[in-house]
Amino acid sequence: MLTDITLGQYYPGDSFLHRMDPRAKILCTMIFICAIFLANNPWSYLLVTIFTLGCIMISGVPPVMVWKAVKPLWVILVFTLLIHVLTTPGKEIFGYGFIHISEEGLRNGLFMTLRLVFLIGFSSLLTYTTSPIVLTDGIEALLNPFRRFGVPAHELAMMMTIALRFIPTLLEETDRIMKAQSSRGADFTSGNLWQKAKGMVPLLVPLFIAAFRRADDLATAMEARCYRGGEGRTKMHQLAYTSRDRLAFTTVFLVTAVLLAMYFYFRT
């Protein structure tokens, strides 16, 4: 079901990750995502796996929720694996007709697929452990230095957060429309891929209408609360780095340093 997709949802809690400064969480997430692409051997992926699982345990977020964030993208993961397996030249381990699978292709395909899994899973922890309001404040604070160049930091942060928050809302709306049309005899499951795609076309009009209606309701609610952008806006909670943020930065930098060392060691 579309409602099983958890991207953009917040999981309330009081864990170490929940209490971190949003700026620290965003920066640590970006650093670790970049570090994932340094993994080029089984030992590196073992370290990435241990670190990711450790963060999931510390966050208090059920592992099944992290899996739900990865599961909807299984088509992309399988496609990525097949592309590498079937197109990478090297020592052949299987061949049949025009299909040739090499040892290098299998390794590269598995590594790239694992990178995507860790990237999606670790990124989902950011939204699971950070409420939309706090996430907006964190993004705005990180973009503030660019305001001198004319970058509207608050407006960009607000748009990004609203877009992320609307993903589960639109998926829920799509699921509701599909159920309503199925009760009237519509069939979204039978037929080939093209027929299923054509069957989704009638969903577009009511979905767009519902999306614009929700956007209008949100705009009305923001105006009713006298929202006028970031100028002169005060915050109930002031952002401040604490010892837990410094500990998180230290841990992420250590993991990145180890991955970088293993990258050059196994590369040679």
Residue ranges and their predicted role:
Residues D14, F37, G60-M65, Y96, ...:
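Membrane-helix interfacial "entry" motifs
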Residues M1-S44, V48-M57, A141-N144, R148-V151, ...:
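Transmembrane alpha-helix interface motif
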Residues L73-A186:
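Juxtamembrane/interface alpha-helical elements of multi-pass membrane proteins
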Residues F51-V61, I76-F79:
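Alpha-helical transmembrane segments and their membrane-interface exit regions
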Residues A69-L77, T113, V117, L207, ...:
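Loop-to-transmembrane-helix entry motif
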Residues N41, Y45, G60-V64, T88-Y96, ...:
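Transmembrane helix-loop junctions in multipass membrane proteins, especially transporters and channels
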Residues K25, V64-W74, A248:
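Alpha-helical transmembrane segments and their helix-start/interface "positive-inside/aromatic belt" motifs
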